[in-house]
């Protein structure tokens, strides 16, 4: 008799996803981040659900309700800090996952890559709206500054911003709708993840060498299930170290001050995982130009497959491209640092140079490096 997991309609789907899936035999730890992202998403949905049971999305009570969760709700503090630091872990895994895709040429699987970009944008939107909910100073002013960027859109900008706010400033209507969106979007993300996997399993996974692994596949279970469990344990270890020992390490102290529309904080900045994009936004002394650069800093990923000039898929055997990739990684760290600094000399100049370098590497240097490497190999 055939095993039930191979014939039952529901078990068959899970079997083809997680058990009998043919996987390349040589995928490294960089391929662990997909499963880690799934773990992060599940964790965020669960902790978020329990937080939503005690949170109130009203300007007069939002801040107090978060305080109430931390002080009075049974293990509320751990749920709150797992959710806040879970977002940081989520973005670390996201950036590693995208970086892996860039390094090993996984963007040649264009459908999977494009759904991935949509996923990235959706998760960023979700995180931004979540940051507004505690209704601290940085929540309020972050929401004001970022939503105000839409006013740079010619002709309809101001109307659009006031439509999103639900009034003439960030207020109760804004908070309520942000809570509604923050609650629903993770489920949209879950649906997109299914589409992401659907497209991935149409072609099969890439591998570090960049060549087809059809002739050498192994079953996902037990080889990669055990590997994913190890990755998950490490992820949870790092998360719990953060939560237990320094839960506010990655947060902003200003968010422990209740939102006050009459007092602007000296340095308005988003969470650390948006600082690179914020630095690019600030590096252009023109509102519309800054907004376009901010959008392009993420949307540039969509044209990466078109800029691929090398005859090899990944960067494993391409030293010039490798150097450029790690220069890009260092540049992103520099931008992240600059985004958290005040707008004054020398940070303005460093930010502008780092922003120019970011776009130059992706749009100019990497395609040129691919051509040079082809010529070196006489291809």
Curated annotation (Swiss-Prot):
Organism whose genome encodes this protein: Otaria byronia
The keyword Acetylation is annotated on this UniProt entry: no
Cofactor note: Binds 2 heme b groups non-covalently.
Name of the protein this chain belongs to: Cytochrome b
Residues the record lists as binding heme b b566: 97, 196
Pfam families referenced in this protein's UniProt entry, alphabetically: Cytochrom_B_C (PF00032), Cytochrome_B (PF00033)
Cofactor: heme b
Family to which the UniProt record says this protein belongs: Belongs to the cytochrome b family.
Gene name, Swiss-Prot/TrEMBL: MT-CYB
GO CC terms in record: mitochondrial inner membrane; respiratory chain complex III
């Amino acid at each position: 008799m055939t095993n039930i997991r191979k014939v039952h309609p529901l078990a068959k789907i899970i079997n083809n996803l997680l058990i009998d899936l043919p996987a390349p035999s040589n995928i490294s730890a960089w391929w662990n981040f997909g499963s880690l992202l799934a773990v992060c998403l599940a964790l965020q949905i669960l902790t978020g659900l329990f937080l939503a049971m005690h949170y109130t999305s009203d300007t007069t009570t939002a801040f107090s309700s978060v305080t109430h969760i931390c002080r009075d709700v049974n293990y509320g503090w751990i749920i709150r800090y797992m959710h806040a630091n879970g977002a940081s872990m989520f973005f670390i895994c996201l950036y590693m996952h995208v970086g892996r895709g860039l390094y090993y040429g996984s963007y040649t699987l264009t459908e999977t890559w494009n759904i991935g970009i949509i996923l990235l944008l959706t998760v960023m939107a979700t995180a931004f709206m979540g940051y507004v909910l505690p209704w601290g100073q940085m929540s309020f002013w972050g929401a004001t500054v970022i939503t105000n960027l839409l006013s740079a859109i010619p002709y309809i900008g101001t109307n659009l911003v006031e439509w999103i706010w639900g009034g003439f400033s960030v207020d109760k209507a804004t908070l309520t709708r942000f809570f509604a969106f923050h609650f629903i979007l993770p489920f949209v993300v879950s649906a997109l993840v299914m589409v992401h996997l659907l497209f991935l399993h149409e072609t099969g996974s890439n591998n570090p060498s960049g060549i087809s692994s059809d002739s050498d596949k192994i079953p996902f279970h037990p080889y990669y299930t055990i590997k994913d469990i190890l990755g998950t344990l490490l992820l949870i270890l790092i998360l719990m170290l953060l939560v237990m020992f320094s839960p506010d390490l990655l947060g902003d102290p200003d968010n422990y001050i209740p939102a006050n529309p009459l007092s602007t904080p000296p340095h308005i900045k988003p969470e650390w995982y948006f600082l690179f994009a914020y630095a690019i936004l600030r590096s252009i002394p023109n509102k519309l130009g800054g907004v376009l650069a901010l959008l392009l800093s993420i949307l540039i990923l969509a044209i990466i497959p078109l800029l691929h000039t090398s005859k090899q898929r990944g960067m494993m055997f391409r030293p010039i491209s490798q150097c450029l990739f790690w220069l890009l990684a260092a540049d992103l760290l520099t931008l992240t640092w600059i985004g958290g600094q005040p707008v004054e000399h020398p940070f303005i100049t460093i930010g502008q140079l780092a922003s120019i370098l970011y776009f130059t590497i992706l749009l100019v240097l990497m395609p040129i490096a691919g051509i040079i490497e082809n010529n070196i190999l006489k291809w």
